[in-house]
């Protein structure tokens, strides 16, 4: 049954699992009110920066970062990737056992990392790959279109290239076989993550910056709550 408040939800728990929209929400809901009882393990799947993850680990000794790679369809089938990061090996192993069903279809996709910040970095790397390849897919379509190729022809020509993964993931949206609303992984969500990447890097990330510009154009057009394939569909 649903609890009336977060405090009621965690009362008596041995392990608390959260998945929220970004680090600011984690601070508001969990850190500032001191939500996690002393001695209780806290597995948080929210996408945050490495700096945020390190701060949460310092604030809550039971913190284990458990970001996931994948969207709703693979989640329903136990096909997510999961990074489990924390300095306490015992807590990390316990949490790994609990979240193992998230990656049940491919257990090798569950990876333990010895710090929460390391797990956060892994998640940003995974989403960086999505951001820059959707930008590459968009630019490939623009190049092909400028030379008279159809969308179908560009999709076919991108087979067996470095963009094949993102093309196979998103071509059904591009070719009208699926609607971009509701989104599996929204433009708002990946734009948020791209900003975390840029803030976390100690150097310029021009490909990420280009991807973010495309995502922000979709947000400005009112399509932030659509699947991030809107970048190619509404290019």
Please state what every model-predicted region is.
Residues 2-64:
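Rossmann-fold NAD(P) dinucleotide-binding segment
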Residues 118-208, 212-229:
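Helical "substrate-binding/catalytic lid" subdomain
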Residues 15, 21, 25, 51, ...:
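Amphipathic alpha-helical hairpins
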Residues 31, 48-127:
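Rossmann-fold dinucleotide-binding core
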Residues 13, 60, 158-161, 215, ...:
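A general structural motif at alpha-helix termini
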Residues 41, 62, 81, 204-206:
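Proline-centered loop/turn at the N-terminus of a beta-strand
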Residues 229-235:
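Short, amphipathic C-terminal "tail helix"
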């Amino acid at each position: 049954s649903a609890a009336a408040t977060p405090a009621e939800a965690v009362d008596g728990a041995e392990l608390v699992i959260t998945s929220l929209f970004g680090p600011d929400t984690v601070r508001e809901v969990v850190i500032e009110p001191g939500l996690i009882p002393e001695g209780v393990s806290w597995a948080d799947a929210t996408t945050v920066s490495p700096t945020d993850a390190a701060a949460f680990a310092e604030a809550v000794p039971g913190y284990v970062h458990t970001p996931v790679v994948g969207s709703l369809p693979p989640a329903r089938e136990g096909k997510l990737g999961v990074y489990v990061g924390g300095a306490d090996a015992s807590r990390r192993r316990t949490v790994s056992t609990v979240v193992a069903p998230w990656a049940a279809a491919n257990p090798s996709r569950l990876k333990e990392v010895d710090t929460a910040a390391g797990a956060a970095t892994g998640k940003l790397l995974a989403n960086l790959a999505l951001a820059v390849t959707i930008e590459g897919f968009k630019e490939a379509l623009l190049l092909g279109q400028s030379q008279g190729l159809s969308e179908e022809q560009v999709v076919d020509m991108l087979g067996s290239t470095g963009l094949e993964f993102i093309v196979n993931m998103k071509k059904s949206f591009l070719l009208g076989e699926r609607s971009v609303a509701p989104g599996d992984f929204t433009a708002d969500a990946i734009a948020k993550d791209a900003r975390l990447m840029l803030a976390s890097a100690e150097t310029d990330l021009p490909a990420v910056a280009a991807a973010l510009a495309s995502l922000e154009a979709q947000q400005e057009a009112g399509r932030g709550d659509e699947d991030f394939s809107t970048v190619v569909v509404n290019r």
